[in-house]
């Protein structure tokens, strides 16, 4: 159903979509390096505090950003894009991260293996382990913050958001690492759902994509190897509300990936919704603000009453 904002919004029925032209383009924006350590991180917004901590000496760092002088607040764990990716400027006032903070959410940002700017070894550690180390690092960072910072984080209201590659990771976490419902709701934004067919849902050379995720160029071997890192394999385990958002003109991951996720979950009577909006694989679309508001509204409706 198309609404007044120009969004195609799911209405509890299966969605049928025709694939026309598969293509792929990568989104780049301005990025900023962040000094890491057990200390406050500098920022120019006096209403916001951000700090980072090393987790158990493993090399994993988590960044926490929130409004100053607030009581315990709900949190959104951010799965960054990539898979190999620099850190965005989380305090860029036009960013989705800044929007979340201003809406009263704390951000928990695991600088998982694959994030650049920490060291070459850390940056390359994810290669050959997509869908494995990124999931492990996200869970480890989340549990660390929930355990050590429950004085400022409302641990009963922790949510999960990921865009692009991060959208793929959150879908995997939904089925493989959320049996305890640590995440009360999840948003996958332009993510991959079925890794087995993803090589043909992007403009990249299929053999290169198969090599990256399955270390093979044989279709049958690839399909078998990626089963354990494909969100589709674990859809029956989804146990919290999930919102899929996808841009109709996305050329990195075909919109049909999110449509398939929604349809499969719907058949299993999962609590799932789908929102499709015009635009390519970037946050910078005409309806950016409306999309951000939709995500926040979704998380707000999923909050548990902790009074």
What are these regions (language model features)?
Residues 4, 9-307:
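Serine-hydrolase catalytic core recognition
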């Amino acid at each position: 159903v198309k609404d007044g904002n120009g969004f195609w919004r799911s209405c509890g029925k299966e969605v049928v979509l025709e694939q026309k032209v598969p293509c792929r383009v990568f989104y780049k924006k301005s990025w900023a390096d962040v000094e890491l350590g057990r200390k406050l991180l500098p920022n120019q917004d006096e209403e916001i505090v951000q700090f980072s901590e090393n987790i158990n000496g493993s090399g994993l760092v988590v960044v926490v950003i929130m409004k100053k002088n607030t009581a315990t607040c709900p949190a959104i764990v951010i799965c960054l894009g990539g898979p190999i990716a620099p850190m965005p400027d989380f305090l860029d006032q036009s960013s989705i991260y800044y929007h979340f903070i201003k809406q009263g959410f704390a951000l928990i940002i695991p600088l998982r293996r694959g994030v650049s700017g920490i060291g070459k070894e850390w940056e390359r550690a994810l290669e050959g382990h997509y869908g494995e180390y990124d999931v492990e690092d996200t869970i480890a960072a989340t549990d660390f913050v929930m355990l050590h910072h429950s004085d400022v984080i409302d641990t009963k209201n922790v949510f999960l958001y990921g865009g692009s590659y991060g959208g793929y990771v959150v879908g995997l976490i939904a089925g493989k690492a959320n049996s305890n419902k640590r995440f009360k709701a999840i948003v996958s934004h332009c993510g991959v759902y079925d890794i087995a067919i993803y090589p043909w849902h992007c403009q990249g050379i299929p053999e290169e994509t198969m090599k990256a995720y399955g270390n093979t160029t044989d279709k049958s071997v690839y399909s078998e190897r990626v089963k354990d890192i494909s969100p589709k394999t674990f859809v029956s385990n989804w146990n919290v509300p999930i919102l899929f958002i996808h841009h109709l003109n996305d050329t990195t991951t075909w919109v049909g990936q999110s449509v398939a996720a929604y349809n499969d979950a719907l058949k299993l009577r999962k609590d799932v919704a789908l929102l499709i909006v015009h635009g390519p694989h970037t946050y910078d679309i005409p309806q950016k603000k409306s999309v951000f508001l939709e995500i926040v509204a979704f998380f707000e409706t999923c909050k548990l009453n902790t009074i």
